[in-house]
Amino acid sequence: KEKFLKNTPAIARLRKDVLNAVEVKGFLRGIDGRVLSIRSPHSALNTLIQSAGALIVKQATIFLHEKIKQENLDCNMVAHIHDEMQLQVKEDIAEYVGQKAVQSIQATQSFFNFRCELDGEYKVGNNWADTH
């Protein structure tokens, strides 16, 4: 672990800053401003990262849902698993909806004023195995 942190000084600094924040405040703030309770200092950075990932995907899902409704697209969300959306879509609009899904993920970057570029990908197939 020490070798990894030595070779990635930005992560080491982030880890130190997160631990200091937990020590001073007793909690962290998520990218949406909510309080993140920290059960143990060693899990603080993971809590921050997992919270951000969950919020990004949920907001992207909202953006995509709004676009689907706005354009009256014939498709249904059939599963939402961690960082993955599964949609049942007519074949003739599958590529278009996939592009809209990626754009929805990208749009969350400015929504949360996120400094890291956000992107996604989509796959078209007949079942979950084809698209996972």
Predicted features and spans:
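Conserved catalytic core of nucleotide polymerization and phosphodiester-bond processing enzymes
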Residues: 1-132
